[in-house]
Each structure stands twice: as C-alpha cells, then as structure tokens.
C-alpha cells in the first residue's frame, strides 16, 4: 500500500476541490479514492488506523506522488471546548508529522471574511439538521458553529503546522490571486506539480471548470420551507428563480465584526509568509491582485 508523500491541508472554501480535481488527473499521482479522507481530524476515521488510511490510495505503478486533500486539516489549533461540538481531533499537525514527517504540504488561503461567509452558506445548503438556517446573522451562526470563524485564523494554525514541518515543505496559494482567475491557473498548477514532485508540464482537462457552484437562493428556500411553503415556491417560474427578492440579506454588521477578528491575524500572516496580502478591507476583490 502506498504511503502519502503530500497533503492538501486547507483552507476550507478556498479552491481545494478544483485543485484536487486537477492533481488527481496527473498520471504520476496516486490520489485518495475520494478528495477528503478526514483521517487525521475525525475520531472514527482516526480509530481505523494507518493500514486503513494507506489502503485508501489508488495503486499506480507510475506514481511518484501519493496524497489527498482534506481542508479541515489546517484547523489544528482547536479550543478544547469545541472538540466534541465539532467532532474534531486536536493537534492534527502533530499527528501528521508523527506518521509522515517528510510530507510536502499544499495550503490554499482565501480572504477570511469571504471564506467564513462561504462556509456558512455551505452549512445552510446542507439543510436544517446541520443547525443553521437561511438569514441567520453571522454572529449567531458563529455561536452555533465556532469553526466558521476559527478555520479562518490562518496565522495561528499555520504557525502550529510550522512547528512540525520546515518552511520548504509548504506551498501557500492565495485563492483570489492563484486559483480564482482563469489566467493564473496553469501557472499555479505548474508550481503545485513541482512542489509535490511530479512532471510540471502535464495539462489536466477542465482547467477553468467551476467546482462547488453555489445553490440558487430559491433552491435553499425550498429546502427549508414547510409543505405549504414548498408548494407555493414551486409555482415560481424558472425564469424568476434567480430574482434578487428571493436572495438572503447581506449582513454588513456581521462582516465588520469578522473583519475586527481577522484584521490582526492577517497582519500576523503577512509576517509569517513574508509577503503582503491585499486583504485590506472586509472583502477581497479579484482585481486587487
């Protein structure tokens, strides 16, 4: 069974689905049988043991790199009070380093306010049983699911990872600069392929495909509506299902609160990475880069 040589460790909602779909096409890569194996962060997966984990990787006689991408791995500095609520193991970086100390690590980071909003929307999209609902304020959502905020504390979590792995083990990509713009994607993949030790000239298909496209507000309203509400919503003609009236209100106060949490962290991250990030207001714009 092949042992991993690289990991994509996050962040959540920062382009990792697209990145893994590109990496998995490379003929020299043995990828996991699915994108996110959650071995190091979910207790029931961890309990299956190393043999189970390594059995999840495809056999590839030409494989030079073996790995998977679970965005939750970046969140290694976890407040103990969150562990049971989030079903998340502590000290992921230490667990990974204890088993595979020579790994190459790929990190994708997105403006933390935008990432938090996207993470919140993703939980809402999954349905009522996940504890959030459409129109909930950011602060209320964060009180119910602390990971919405905590997973955006990049400096704190990367610092923990860098206690276990040398700087040269990390390739850090910025979503708004390296992943979202179509013009940047080919160069980004060359850097990734070089970092994990496979031929950088490979060109995967679907380079500009969109992954994890956001559900229309109409579809989310149908998911949360009662029986009578669903019947009424189904009378809305398809041409009007994207109408702004069906969208959920913005939460500028909540975004400003997130910014007050994250702004000092962004400055710490810049110091840690030795580069300036143009995340200088509550939301990032692609043309900032």
Which residues fall in each region the model found?
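Anion-recognition interface
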Residues: 1-289
């Amino acid at each position: 069974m092949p042992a991993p040589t690289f990991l994509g460790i996050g962040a959540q909602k920062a382009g990792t689905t697209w990145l893994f779909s590109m990496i998995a096409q490379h003929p020299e890569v043995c990828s996991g049988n699915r994108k996110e194996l959650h071995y190091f962060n979910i207790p029931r997966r961890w309990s299956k043991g190393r043999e189970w984990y390594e059995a999840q990787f495809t056999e590839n006689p030409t494989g030079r790199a073996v790995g998977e991408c679970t965005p939750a791995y970046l969140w290694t500095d976890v407040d103990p009070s969150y562990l049971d609520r989030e079903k998340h193991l502590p000290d992921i970086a230490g667990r990974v380093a204890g088993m595979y100390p020579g790994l190459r690590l790929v990190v994708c980071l997105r403006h933390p306010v935008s990432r938090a909003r996207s993470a919140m929307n993703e939980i809402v999209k999954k349905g009522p049983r996940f504890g959030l609902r459409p129109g909930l304020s950011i602060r209320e959502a964060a009180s119910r699911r602390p990971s919405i905020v905590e997973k955006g504390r990049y400096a704190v979590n990367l610092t923990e990872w860098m206690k276990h792995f040398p700087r040269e083990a990390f390739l850090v990509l910025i979503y708004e600069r390296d992943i979202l713009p179509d013009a940047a994607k080919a160069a980004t993949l060359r850097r990734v392929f070089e970092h994990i030790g496979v031929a950088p000239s490979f060109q995967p298909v679907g380079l500009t495909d969109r992954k994890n496209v956001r559900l229309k507000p109409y579809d989310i309203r149908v998911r949360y509506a009662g029986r009578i509400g669903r019947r009424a919503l189904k009378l809305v003609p398809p041409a009007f299902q994207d109408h702004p009236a069906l969208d959920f209100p913005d939460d500028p106060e909540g975004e400003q609160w997130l910014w007050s949490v994250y702004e000092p962290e962004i400055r710490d991250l810049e110091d840690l990475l030795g580069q300036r990030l143009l995340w200088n207001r509550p939301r990032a714009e692609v043309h900032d880069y």
